[in-house]
């Protein structure tokens, strides 16, 4: 009996030690430091604070984009779509898609292609009456996106809510899905999408490397990764002006328009903490992507990085 009690006592001690180590390991993981803007915080705190930032700014997000960039963000996003060149049947994952700007442009692009093809088709047909022409357009209407689809994925439910309301208001319904999901752990199977885009979102991710690996995983072989993000200005004079504007003007705009100085102070700081164009290019390559390059827009205020899953 004494021997048995000794064995049981030893096993209980062993179990307590295992539990203690597991608890210590969990505590250590939760306390791993990262950055929230210029502040050092735990990884868990960063996730919570970033979520709160976008929860706070969701309803003023589009207005602030126009105000902060003086409307230039529209040109940057249009440029991204021109680089993408959507084709019929393309499946797009619009990560951190929030209020839908990239996906709406994607749908517009596909619709414009469809209209162009219908016009070309009708030009080659002779002696068409107006009812014939009208019927041709009506018959094509059901397949207006020609099998193309955009999945808008965002970790922030308030951003998705605002985006969905916006899509209904603007008449976008066909070919869109709205999914709550984490860029570091996507709720999709392997090899699902032709294109993965993330616009002004990846700098807010806690583990950028993990998000890049997930992007690679969900893309089909031959699929393309496209990232539009604030970057490092390569014009010395513009860089000085940009710094003054970023730190002295943007937080003020945030306070005046959105009644939220702190969120926009963080956004400015997060831009400065983001890797340079070459550093981010190397990170994309490390995730497995091939033929990685980037294009600077507005002297490097933003950059579009591109890579392929080959």
UniProtKB/Swiss-Prot annotation:
Q: What does this protein do?
A: Methyltransferase required for the conversion of 2-polyprenyl-6-methoxy-1,4-benzoquinol (DDMQH2) to 2-polyprenyl-3-methyl-6-methoxy-1,4-benzoquinol (DMQH2).
One record GO biological process: ubiquinone biosynthetic process
Assembly and oligomerization: Component of a multi-subunit COQ enzyme complex, composed of at least coq3, coq4, coq5, coq6, coq7 and coq9.
Which InterPro entries does the UniProt record give?
SAM-dependent_MTases_sf, UbiE/COQ5_MeTrFase, UbiE/COQ5_MeTrFase_CS
Q: In which pathway does it act?
A: Cofactor biosynthesis; ubiquinone biosynthesis
Give the enzyme's EC designation. 2.1.1.201
Q: Which of the seven top EC classes does this enzyme belong to? A: transferase
Q: What is this protein called?
A: 2-methoxy-6-polyprenyl-1,4-benzoquinol methylase, mitochondrial
What species is this protein from? Xenopus laevis (African clawed frog)
A GO cellular component annotation in the UniProt record? extrinsic component of mitochondrial inner membrane
| Family label | Belongs to the class I-like SAM-binding methyltransferase superfamily. MenG/UbiE family.
Reactions accelerated catalytically: a 2-methoxy-6-(all-trans-polyprenyl)benzene-1,4-diol + S-adenosyl-L-methionine = a 5-methoxy-2-methyl-3-(all-trans-polyprenyl)benzene-1,4-diol + S-adenosyl-L-homocysteine + H(+)
Q: Which domain of life is it from?
A: Eukaryota
Instruction: Show which residues constitute the signal peptide.
Output: none
Q: Which residues bind S-adenosyl-L-methionine?
A: 99, 154, 182-183
